[in-house]
Amino acid sequence: MQVEVDLPNHSYHIKIEEGCFSEAGDWVSHLWQKQMITIITDSNVEILYGESLVNQLKKQGFTVHVFSFAAGEASKTLEVANRIYGFLAKHHMTRSDGIIALGGGVVGDLAAFVASTYMRGIHFLQIPTSLTAQVDSSIGGKTGVNTSFAKNMVGTFAQPDGVLIDPVTLKTLGNRELVEGMGEVIKYGLIDDIKLWHILEEMDGTIDSILDSALAIIYHSCQVKRKHVLADQYDKGLRMHLNFGHTIGHAIEVHAGYGEIMHGEAVAIGMIQLSRVAERKNLMPRGISQDIYNMCLKFGLPVHYAEWDKDVLFDILSHDKKASGQFIKIVILPQLGSATVHQIPLEEMRDYLEK
């Protein structure tokens, strides 16, 4: 399977195929004729896939370096980015060379941020190995690092030269790491793909069901992401639908401490919480929040956050990128499979944090 992303100023393809990681070197050689490549990865993924990718690239004649950092959301910082800049400079990486992001969402966001800012931008590729990265963060060109104030507070828009997705890599994930990716998959079904929602309804929620259906749910998710990115590359309109559940979700991630609550888990809680309040305000049809709750519960996603503190969460989300002056934009669902953006006074977000 292949998904084409044809943007006005940059086009690339997303290759989705079981077992395609074993052909990554050949894939890269058809996209790049560069002399030097730095693979950016984390300590977990390096052990699983680092040596294989290095060997594949060397067989194609590339000079290869590897930068690995401690796995986890806590590493997605300007401090780690600065270490990578130093590594690239030490190895005399230039704008004619390239970066490959090998790993999950943290790796992809951080590596893409570095690539887009080092020497004002060098080329990069994404090889995502987690479900969250395969269905969401590796696609669309958003890069970013976290700060103590907010998630992804510092970032850029930069498109990769290609994305290689091998669903087989999901088999090396722990159960929690696999399940958290379903938060984003469920979101796609809710905002724009009723067929995907029906696929999820037919699944029994087990780990095996996720792995067995991986190719289909990744493809559907990539198609939804592609549609929104093509229509709104810089997140000014339609693409904002992809933020459903994220305003509250990101606040939960910051409040819990980066890495304590995984991204897809926080999104699941955020979707449920926002929908319940939106229903009470008659902004959404009754029953959708229960549908979301049931779907998240079926796949083993958390449906509540034990350390809920509405005042602290409000303070955090007031720094959200979707806030503008005294207003903030939220995403609501007129029906299953459809989304719209609704602007409210920032202060009204306190209502959406009421349990």
UniProtKB/Swiss-Prot annotation:
Reactions the enzyme catalyzes: 7-phospho-2-dehydro-3-deoxy-D-arabino-heptonate = 3-dehydroquinate + phosphate
Pathway(s) of this molecule: Metabolic intermediate biosynthesis; chorismate biosynthesis; chorismate from D-erythrose 4-phosphate and phosphoenolpyruvate: step 2/7
Cofactor(s) this protein requires: NAD(+); Co(2+); Zn(2+)
Gene Ontology molecular function: any one: metal ion binding
InterPro entries listed in its UniProt record: Dehydroquinate_synthase, DHQ_synth_AroB, DHQ_synth_fam, DHQS/DOIS_N, DHQS_C
UniProt entry keywords in alphabetical sequence: Amino-acid biosynthesis, Aromatic amino acid biosynthesis, Cobalt, Cytoplasm, Lyase, Metal-binding, NAD, Nucleotide-binding, Zinc
Enzyme class label: lyase
Subcellular location as annotated: Cytoplasm
Binding-site residues for Zn(2+), renumbered to this chain: E184, H246, H263
Entry EC number(s): 4.2.3.4
GO BP terms, alphabetized: amino acid biosynthetic process; aromatic amino acid family biosynthetic process; chorismate biosynthetic process
The record's free-text note on cofactor binding: Binds 1 divalent metal cation per subunit. Can use either Co(2+) or Zn(2+).
Principal place of residence: cytoplasm
Binding site for NAD(+): G105, V106, V107, G108, D109, T129, S130, K142, K151, T169, L170, K171, T172
One GO cellular component, as annotated: cytoplasm
CDD domains: DHQS
Chain's role: Catalyzes the conversion of 3-deoxy-D-arabino-heptulosonate 7-phosphate (DAHP) to dehydroquinate (DHQ).
Family that this chain belongs to: Belongs to the sugar phosphate cyclases superfamily. Dehydroquinate synthase family.
HAMAP family (alphabetical): DHQ_synthase
Descriptive protein name: 3-dehydroquinate synthase
Organism: Streptococcus agalactiae serotype III (strain NEM316)
Lineage of the organism: Bacteria, Bacillati, Bacillota, Bacilli, Lactobacillales
